[in-house]
Amino acid sequence: MEDRYLYTTAVPILLGGGRLAGKTAQYLYGHYGLEVRWLGDTWHPLLAIYAKRLASLPLTEENDATVTRHLLALAEGYRRSVGIPAIIPCSPEAEAYLTRAEDTLEEEFVLLPLPDLTQSPLRGLLRREDTP
């Protein structure tokens, strides 16, 4: 069962790029009408339609500090809003980055797993709400 309110207050931030990011952005816009943000360097046509690009940065260890700065600056804007900023990795590189930066980001964002699109990419929000 979905909690539509929880899903529609999410602020999805896609990390990575390519086809999975494009399909995830399309899913989130189509199912929930969500404005999706995207940070990555691999373009896909669906991203141009369904996502607002934050920055074009490769997700390499050398860029970790820059990517983290971009994300934390974005989090500043959501501190006083009702939105729930949620990072969704869309590539193996994005998953690896989140593993490296988890301690820094987990206070500001909900960190979700790589989506498979057979279920909502935001399903992890429900599990997060159940934890103390």
Language model features: what each stretch is:
Residues 1-122:
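ATP-binding N-terminal substructure of ATP-dependent carboxylate-amine bond-forming enzymes
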Residues 121-132:
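Active-site nucleotide/adenylate-binding loops and adjacent lid/helix of ATP-dependent enzymes
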